[in-house]
Each structure stands twice: as structure tokens, then as C-alpha cells.
From Swiss-Prot:
Its main location: cytoplasm. It is found in: Cytoplasm. One of its GO terms (biological process) is gene expression. Belongs to the RNase PH family. Rrp41 subfamily. Its EC number is 3.1.13.-. This is Exosome complex component Rrp41. Catalytic component of the exosome, which is a complex involved in RNA degradation. Has 3'->5' exoribonuclease activity. Can also synthesize heteromeric RNA-tails. The keyword Cytoplasm applies. Keywords: Cytoplasm, Exonuclease, Exosome, Hydrolase, Nuclease. Pfam families: RNase_PH, RNase_PH_C. One of its GO terms (molecular function) is 3'-5'-RNA exonuclease activity.
Length: 249
């Protein structure tokens, strides 16, 4: 959160935001499953101006062997921002923020996976941010969850994520870049909707207790809308496969 220029209005007198959205409106979201031929599972998500690719490999044998768990698979997540993903070119390779977000995403996804079915193996998730525009962690979780489902990894539920935040004293859904830079708070949330479980809850900034509750409720509502889009994307992929199989008869 940065100091806002005096002439920048994030929300107008009609409740419209800088990009024309209403307070409780998501940015446009597009999802596609099975986009990489050489991965066990993959997904591509465009969320506002974010462009994110997720690939899953595994379950596969772990090297070195001392990392193996005798009772379950281990989940490894690598979140990376491409050098060209932001306006000021980023140094290649993982930085402290990428390492931290990798851990956050792993923690959000792990409760959904039935890892005990694959002892002594690893499931690797690679999340590549091709273009960044605020909310990359929730978009990354959403893409990774789709890629896991595409890989056929047994899951208790999909994990869907969304953030709410505070701009100019108002609680709003799904912050864009300007709102994230100059707003007062950001609350990313990830859920397993069928189980009604929260797998990620963070806050950056300052909110009153009532504002925090409102932001969490709004983020959950947004995540449920994202979940429906995930289901549609998976359905679309398998309808395509069915058509291809049917067409080959």
C-alpha cells in the first residue's frame, strides 16, 4: 500500500471504481484447462490483466530419497514472476516474495489433496506469472487447483480464491493494480466450497473488526463465483474430449 496521489480518485460519487466496476464486481476472468501437452495437468487463467499459467507433474518419485514421506506424497510449489510480467523488469529467478507466496499457495492447496494415496512421491506445481496486475496469489491458487484436477490428482474439493479490500473507506471486491497500490487493505481468501472450509486467510493493511468481517464475507462470495468458473472450465475440457472420442468412431 502506497501513498495515493491527491488527484487520483479510486471510487467516484456513483460508487464506480477506476476501471468502471461496481464495488462488488469481479474483474473479467477467463480459464482454460489442459493447455500444456507435456505436463500431467495444466491450466491458464486470465484475471483482469493477470495472465497465469500453472503446470502439475506427478505423483512422481522423489530425489533425493531422504525427502520421501512413508505415509504420504509431498506437495512442492514454485511460484515465479516472469521478468517481463511487471512494468519494471524483474530480475530472473526466485526472490523472497516468490518463495513466501509459494509457501502460502502450498498451504492453501494441501488441505484439498488426498496425499496419503501416494506415499514416497512428490507432486510438483509450477505457477508462472506472465503478466501481473494485483491478486496474483489468488489467481495462482485458482489456476493451480484447476491444473491439479486436470492431472487427475484425487481432491476433496477444488480450491477457489479471491480477495476483497478497502479503498477510500469502502470495502470492495477483487482489487486491481491501482487499488492494490493505493488502497487501505487487502484480504485474500481461499476456500473449499463443498466442505465450507477456508484454506487461506491473510490481511495486508488496517481494518476495523466489522470491516474485516465484511471483507472476508465478500471475498468468500467472490471465491464461490470463481469456483463456478473453475467447474465450467473443467466441464468444457471434458466435453471437448468426449467430442473428439465420439468423432473418431
Amino acid at each position: 500500500m502506497m501513498g495515493k496521489p491527491e488527484d487520483l480518485k479510486l471510487i467516484d460519487e456513483n460508487g464506480r471504481r477506476i476501471d468502471g466496476r461496481k464495488k462488488y464486481e469481479l474483474r473479467p476472468i477467463k480459464m482454460e484447462v489442459g493447455v500444456l501437452k507435456n505436463a500431467d495437468g495444466s491450466a491458464y487463467v486470465e484475471w483482469g490483466k493477470n495472465k497465469i499459467l500453472a503446470a502439475v507433474y506427478g505423483p512422481r518419485e522423489i530425489h533425493p530419497k531422504h525427502l520421501q514421506r512413508p505415509d504420504r506424497a509431498i506437495l512442492r510449489v514454485r511460484y515465479n514472476m516472469a521478468p517481463f510480467s511487471v512494468e519494471e523488469r524483474k530480475k530472473p529467478g526466485p526472490d523472497r516474495r516468490s518463495v513466501e507466496i509459494s509457501k502460502v499457495i502450498r498451504g492453501a492447496l494441501e488441505p484439498a489433496l488426498i496425499l496419503e494415496m501416494f506415499p514416497r512421491t512428490a507432486i510438483d506445481i509450477f505457477i508462472e506469472v506472465l503478466q501481473a496486475d494485483a491478486g496474483t496469489r489468488v489467481a495462482g491458487i485458482t489456476a493451480a487447483s484447476l491444473a491439479l484436477a486436470d492431472a487427475g490428482i484425487p481432491m476433496r474439493d477444488l480450491v477457489a480464491a479471491c480477495a476483497a479490500g478497502k479503498i477510500e473507506g469502502e470495502i470492495v471486491l477483487d482489487l486491481n493494480k491501482e487499488e492494490d497500490n493505493y488502497g487501505e487493505a487487502d484480504v485474500p481468501v481461499a476456500i473449499m466450497p463443498l466442505k465450507n472450509d477456508i484454506t487461506l486467510l491473510q490481511m495486508d493493511g488496517y481494518l476495523t473488526r466489522d470491516e474485516f468481517i465484511e471483507a472476508v464475507r465478500l471475498a468468500i462470495k467472490g471465491a464461490k463465483a470463481v469456483y463456478q468458473k473453475q467447474r465450467e472450465a473443467l466441464k468444457e475440457k471434458y466435453l471437448k474430449i468426449a467430442e473428439e472420442v465420439g468423432g473418431g468412431e
